[in-house]
Amino acid sequence: MNKLNLGILAHVDAGKTSLTERLLHRTGVIDEVGSVDAGTTTTDSMELERQRGITIRSAVATFVLDDLKVNLIDTPGHSDFISEVERALGVLDGAVLVVSAVEGVQPQTRILMRTLRRLGIPTLVFVNKIDRGGARPDGVLREIRDRLTPAAVALSAVADAGTPRARAIALGPDTDPDFAVRVGELLADHDDAFLTAYLDEEHVLTEKEYAEELAAQTARGLVHPVYFGSALTGEGLDHLVHGIRELLPSVHASQDAPLRATVFKVDRGARGEAVAYLRLVSGTLGTRDSVTLHRVDHTGRVTEHAGRITALRVFEHGSATSETRATAGDIAQAWGLKDVRVGDRAGHLDGPPPRNFFAPPSLETVIRPERPEEAGRLHAALRMLDEQDPSIDLRQDEENAAGAVVRLYGEVQKEILGSTLAESFGVRVRFDPTRTVCIEKPVGTGEALIELDTRTHNYFWGAPWVCASDRPSPARAITFRLAVELGSLPLAFHKAIEETVHTTLRHGLYGWQVTDCAVTLTRTGVRSPVSAADDFRKANARLVLMDALGRAGTEVHEPVSSFELEVPAARLSPVLAKLAELGATPGVPTAEGDVFRLEGTMPTSLVHDFNQRVPGLTQGEGVFLAEHRGYRPAVGQPPVRPRPEGPNPLNRDEYILHVLKRV
């Protein structure tokens, strides 16, 4: 049986989870369609999801269409949970992007479609809520072509839009006399061979040839079929199901190839054990199999660790069922991988590590328990949540051991995190105000040398070496290079030094993560048997690295976002004034009828505040879209983040005193 891993994506409240329910009902998986408002949906299983009526974590359900097994992945719609969407994108074969026929194309819709197109993921568009008052299918189709993709092709139309009688009508040669021309011209734009056949007057293309070319170009992500319907009533669902079965590319991967799988979700079982969700790309996986997990950290380093599968479930007909083996194309739940994390790749590692599709969180906050004696429970709970969502980048609070620092996309995510800790772990917490996460970049090259030898009245046996810090490629990487013979130190010492380089550069001269930095080890020495790898890990590496970094100097960079803004002509002046007040850099406005479009950049820290002001500034008619676009040097006094508790490697004497417990 062929398999299709299908993602359902949408702006919040477009009806994504309702569509998932309707698909599961249509294919016989569930007897009754659940309601988001009533908290009875299949994929929103968390209590918080049911209470708030939003999807917070990706969920999997399975149905069968003839000889096609579809693993349906329902993803969050709110932008604060974009990291869940990112993890789902990495395992998809195709997607359905849901758009409301009333609200139309929203900012989050545009971000999602840009990413789907950039990744080449075959995508169908489903315009939902055609039966709701205010539905405007023709206008939304124009928005899709103007704002999402010019290669949108409508395969259905709507009669009696905006009423309970709304109907979806399939478009084709029998119902639309212009269908062949409209579809043929679009397909000819993307394929020269089809263009030649289309223009050949001696050969009239058949309906089958049009259908085959449409399927081929949809599978390549070149065109995007659009369907209309209502998840509430089920109208138009048959057309969408036909598109899923006939237009999206299914997988029939080799089971004889080496195992390759990706962990895209981690849950906890009833006894607190880790449960990994894996999408198998090739090969097979079964109970009692030994597995090698490959993990890529934020600097690009790859580490390996082993695990053994103690139990395995494969998704079949709605929910996971016990199986002995999962095969290529399956999504499986695996028990026994104690050290598993989201993003790990299992089995054979080939090709570069997966890159991030969306920007990392640009905000961070400090969490503290309301009752100090619950600090241990708080940290244990946060470690479990960090396994499930590594983007929160959990670390110890530098100023208070009872607290912890996490990274966030927005205030809604912070609210959900607080509710999760209270309701799932019994720990009530308070948050500090959020702050923007900056980075540091070296501005020059620095060298340092430290010789530590008790015979010269220094503090411990160590190694003389030099570290240079400069700007390498690729961007945002930390690279560690050897300019010495590998045998100049025991291998454990080299590993200790490299590990320490990466951990030390999490806090630069101003306390921020250092990026775009190359570190070169140019001299080494060891006096056996007194020197130990821990000497290099605790002191030598940190001291000499921070000394070299100080000589090179660093510059703090703040995150910056690009923005697009649509403003009624009458409200352009106050909007420009507010942008100037906030320190944004707008471009030249362009007029389109009675609306002005404006592009520019602004510090990411201002995006949330400005987005909240747009309705008031534009009398409810403005549209604002912002995306992370990188970093730029911070203006004015560089912001400083407190360093971790403990000895400060920027103060050599203090650091040695604390690390070695002697003078």
Swiss-Prot record:
Positions that bind GTP: 10-17, 74-78, 128-131
InterPro entries: EFG_III/V, EFG_V-like, G_TR_CS, P-loop_NTPase, Ribosomal_Su5_D2-typ_SF, Ribsml_uS5_D2-typ_fold_subgr, Small_GTP-bd, T_Tr_GTP-bd_dom
Gene3D superfamilies, sorted: 3.30.230.10, Elongation Factor G (Translational Gtpase), domain 3 (3.30.70.870), P-loop containing nucleotide triphosphate hydrolases (3.40.50.300), Translation factors (2.40.30.10)
Entry's Gene Ontology molecular function annotations: GTP binding; GTPase activity
Domain spans labelled tr-type G: 1-252
UniProt keyword GTP-binding present: yes
UniProt keyword list: Antibiotic resistance, GTP-binding, Nucleotide-binding, Protein biosynthesis
BP-aspect Gene Ontology terms: response to antibiotic; ribosome disassembly; translation
Listed CDD domains: Tet_C, Tet_II, Tet_III, TetM_like
Protein task: Abolishes the inhibitory effect of oxytetracycline on protein synthesis by a non-covalent modification of the ribosomes.
Listed PANTHER family: RIBOSOME-RELEASING FACTOR 2, MITOCHONDRIAL, TRANSLATION ELONGATION FACTOR G-RELATED
Family: Belongs to the TRAFAC class translation factor GTPase superfamily. Classic translation factor GTPase family. TetM/TetO subfamily.
Protein name from the UniProt record: Oxytetracycline resistance protein
Species in which this protein is naturally found: Streptomyces rimosus
Source taxonomy: Bacteria, Bacillati, Actinomycetota, Actinomycetes, Kitasatosporales
Gene transcribed to yield this protein: otrA
